[in-house]
Amino acid sequence: EIRDVVSEDTIVVSIAPGKKLAWMEGLFEKPLKIVRTMPNTPALVGEGMSCVCGNEKCSSEDVNTVCRIFAGFGKTEIVEEDMIDVVVGVSGSSPAYVFMFIEAMADAAVADGMPRAQAYRFAAQAVLGSAKMVLETGKHPGELKDMVCSPKGTTIEAVRVLEEKGLRSAVFE
């Protein structure tokens, strides 16, 4: 639809997952500046994590312009194109996994008698605070996990159950 209206100095920004820069270049009859991006849904609340990658026609200033736009709804990093599909799994799709985890924690709290709205607040805040600890302390997530686990405690028991049930392998797959 935009093929006939874009000029060679226009930066075309794509959020289409799985569509490579070369494929997008083939859609146009003239060489254009194309930036491939992958935002995620936390951008809706200003906490998105997006990646950007420009084609050979893009200057670093072109790519930085797109980064500044995307910074308006979260953080942005420049990546090589072969990393964009990796970003889909680790950032683009992962909010759904986190929502499932929050829901499961809240369901467990509800099963123990906590009102659902309160359970969601506790579970979501725990995830938010934990994420901030990873980002702000610079400590390895395993080290932070170990800080919560005490010998023969309820947390290490819960970690054992999560390991037995295959949390890591499910995420890794």
Placement of each model-derived feature along the sequence:
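A short acidic, helix-capping loop that chelates divalent metal ions and anchors anionic groups
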Residues: L44-G48, V86-V88, E157
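Internal alpha-helical scaffold of NAD(P)-dependent oxidoreductase catalytic cores
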Residues: W23, L27-K33, M49-V86, F99-E136
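Glycine/serine-rich anion-binding loops at beta->alpha junctions
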Residues: M38-A43, V88-V98
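Alpha-helix N-cap/helix-start capping motif
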Residues: P17-G18, P39, E81, P95, ...
